[in-house]
Each structure stands twice: as C-alpha cells, then as structure tokens.
Regions:
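Mid-domain catalytic core of redox enzymes
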Residues: 218-350
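Glycine-centered tight beta-turn/hairpin loop motif at sheet-sheet or coil-to-beta transitions
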Residues: 33, 78-80, 235-237
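N-terminal glycine-rich dinucleotide-binding loop that anchors FAD/FMN and/or NAD(P) in oxidoreductases
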Residues: 27-53
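Conserved flavin/dinucleotide-binding core of flavoenzymes
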Residues: 28, 86-89, 294, 307-427
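Helical element adjacent to the flavin cofactor pocket in flavoenzyme catalytic cores
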Residues: 174-235, 240-243
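Hydrophobic anchor at the start of a short beta-strand
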Residues: 9-12, 64, 245
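Glycine-rich FAD pyrophosphate-binding loop
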Residues: 6-30
Length: 427
C-alpha cells in the first residue's frame, strides 16, 4: 500500500520492528561456506495463485528460482516407531518398507484419490460454508486414515494450526482452497518458486526509494480520528497529524491501535482470533522424520491429540541453499533444539479462519475510509502473501487514485470487495 501510494502522495511508514518486511524475514546463518540467507516466514509462491506477487517481482526485477513443495507426515503411534510417509513417489510412500503391508496406508491412498476426484462436485453442495471440516469428512464416509494421517496434518501445516482447530475449519473454505491451489490434483500441480537470496531482496527493492520515510522501531501506540485528520502517537513519544491512515497490521493489532474504535470496527476487527507460533531456525535433525528417505520440504511432526502443530521446513530443499549444513525452520517443537544447533528463535502470529472470522471477513471492506482510516493485511483473504498484497493494492487505489503498474486477471480475486464476483479463494 505504501509503495503504490508513494508514487503520487507523501507517505510516512511507522514500523514497530527494527527492520521492514514483517513475515518476509530472512535470517543469515553461519555455515562452513560462509553466511547463508534463509527465509523463516514467507518462503514460496506460485504464479497461478499469486498473480500480483508475480507481477510485483517482475516489475521490481526480483530474481527467483524453482522450489520444491513435497510433503511428509511423521505421526505418533504409541509405539517406538512412528508412522511415516511422504508424497514423493513410491519410495517416499513406502520409505518405511513396513508400510507396504499397512492396510491403513492403502485405505488412505484410496480415499485420497476418491476425495480428489469428488472435490469439485462436493464444493457445490449447500451449507458447507457453515459445516466443520471434521463433520463433513465423517458424513462423507471418509476414514480416520484419510482424516488423521493426511488431510488434517496437511491443513495444520498450511495454516499453522493445531488439529483441533483444523477440524473446525469450514468445509467449503477447505475444498475451495485446496482445489484452487492444485492440491487436489493428482497431476498438473502449480510450480512453486522462491526469491533468490531470500525475501529480504524484494523487501529491499520495495523500500529502497523510500529511505527517510520509513521509521523503524516506531510502533504506533494510538490512532485518534477527527473531522480534519488523523493523530498518530508512536512508541517513541512522537505525535503527528496526517490526512489519512492505513493500518497494515494484524486485525487484532489494528483494533488495539484505535483509541476511539466504533462498534463496527470492534465487531469486525475483533472477530478474528490469532495463533501464536514459535519458529526456530536450526540444524538439529531430531525434528525431522526418522526415515531419511521421508524427508520433504514440509514435514508434519505429529505429537498426538492436544499438541500444538509442529512442522519442520527443510530449507535446503525449499531454497536450494548453497551449503552442506542442513537447515530447518521448525514451528512449535515439543522441546527446544539443542543450543549448538540454534540459529534464531522467532515468534509469528497467524490468523485463524473459523466461521465467525469468515463472516466478519466478508464485511471488512465496509469500514474502509471511515473517519479517514483504512485497513489491509493478509487477514482480508487466506492469510498468505498474495492476500495481503491484494488488500494493500486495493486500498492504495481506492484511497489515492493510483493504479498498480500491471494488469492481471481477477486482480482482487482473493479478497471480498463490494460488488465483486464470488472470490476465487474463500480461504
């Protein structure tokens, strides 16, 4: 939003952190070959589902490279050995050769094929926007093998949510997201890419022309509105008046900044819960599947009922890191990695798209511009980079009379705009 608005207007950015970028957070790891940049938040995108991000990268001349998006699950069984498989062909599925004789695994595979084939028709059923995913799967006759060993772990890995919350996920949102992202296709899945040198490279290009107008370490304490403008009080004690304010933060943080929020702002911005996730950048292989042949880009490490979601991202594979040191980003491990393996600990908050949140989400745009205040963030869509970008660009265009320097099909298809067609992705 600030990038596009500043092409015509005088824009000041208040950033709470000491670096710009938010979840575009590249950490430099010391490796035998030298310093290696590793992403820990935003990591990958694809051109099919991220049209504006793709266009932005091309406009800024950001160099990208192919990535790998394989998925594996390592599940607690109550026995000494875990149940493990990956989607990387037969050798991944049967990496543990005992899986060949596992009736549960064969049933899971058969039901994956059945669900993927039925998904387009299932998404047309009425009432699925209010039906929890767990209830939907049971009503459709899918077994615990499909639910507990594949779908729920994959959803938990994508949205960084515990299994209990994934089961309450609206079934329609799940079906549309998986279908639109090619996750229910047995072939023809989108090709994923990553920013060469880490996402810091695009953040640098996005901000380099605005030096002096980005105030780092200047979190906003309070925003107050009146008939003539907006008063912004920051954490450093500064107080300034502006014509308009764009609050580009999580919805709960946005609400916390408003010192004079009205009832509608409190209802809509307060409707979306957030999940705190602890991420560790480290080199401890104990947080990967036991079977080395199972190792994939995304590795769901199941710890049983009631455990927080634990996912390990194999960064060497995701970003083709130029090092022999194996580096991982693990969310919510049951214990901390060994200290000599730790590079960095980071805290991230992710939106939880429960039914109440989705109802509020469809009404969010009605508060745009009220009392000179605008909002944008990934919570307007699916919680991903493209969603935040679409919201920010749409706000800039509506507020500032500016236009993004590219044309893409269905440019705001992931967010709910007044008078727009049904969103391309609900979540």
């Amino acid at each position: 939003a600030a990038w596009l608005l500043s092409s015509r207007h005088h824009v000041t950015v208040f950033e709470k952190e000491t670096r710009p970028g938010g979840h575009s957070n590249t950490i430099v790891a010391d490796c035998p070959e030298g310093p290696v940049p590793v992403d820990t938040g935003f990591i990958v995108y694809n051109e099919r589902n991220y049209p504006n991000l793709t266009a932005l990268f091309r406009h800024l001349d950001v160099e990208t490279q192919a990535s790998n998006m394989s998925f594996a699950a390592s599940l607690e069984t109550g026995c000494k050995r875990r149940f493990e498989y990956s989607g990387s062909g037969l050798n991944g599925i049967f990496a543990d050769r005992r899986n060949i004789a596992s009736l549960r695994l064969w049933r899971m595979i058969g039901e994956i094929v059945r669900l993927y084939r039925a998904a387009p028709d299932l998404a047309l059923q009425t009432g699925l926007d209010e039906k929890p995913l767990g209830v939907f799967l049971r009503e459709q006759g899918y077994s615990a093998a499909l639910r507990d060993d594949h779908l729920l772990p994959m959803c938990a890995a994508i949205w960084s949510l515990p299994l209990e919350r994934v089961e309450q996920f609206p079934a329609l949102a799940f079906l549309r997201f998986f279908d639109n992202h090619g996750l229910m296709g047995l072939k023809g899945r989108p090709a994923w890419r990553t920013v060469k040198g880490g996402s810091r490279e695009y953040v640098r290009k996005l901000t380099e022309a605005r030096e002096g107008r980005i105030r780092l370490g200047a979190g906003v304490e309070t925003v107050r509105r009146d008939e003539t403008g907006v008063l912004v009080l920051d954490a450093r004690g500064g107080c300034e008046r502006f014509d308009h304010v764009v609050i580009a933060a999580h919805s709960d943080e946005a609400l916390g900044m408003l010192g004079d929020a009205d009832e509608t702002e409190r209802r809509l911005l307060g409707a979306m819960p957030y999940q705190r996730n602890i991420a560790w950048l480290h080199s401890d292989p104990a947080f990967m599947p036991d079977e080395r042949r199972v190792w994939s880009s995304w590795n769901y490490m199941g710890g049983g009922a009631g455990s927080p979601v634990c996912v390990s991202y194999w960064m060497n594979r995701l970003q083709a890191l130029p090092t022999e040191r194996q580096l991982f980003v693990t969310l919510n491990p049951s214990r901390e990695p060994e200290s000599d393996h730790v590079v960095k600990r980071i805290e991230y908050d992710h939106p939880v798209f429960d039914m109440g949140a989705l109802v509020a989400q469809r009404q969010l745009w009605q508060i745009q511009g009220t009392r000179r205040t605008w909002f944008c963030g990934a919570y307007f869509g699916s919680g991903f980079h493209e969603d935040g970008l679409q919201a920010g660009l749409a706000v800039a265009e509506q507020l500032g009379g500016v236009r993004r320097p590219w044309v893409v099909e269905n440019q705001s298809g992931r967010i709910s705009l007044p008078g727009s067609a049904v969103r391309e992705q609900v979540v």
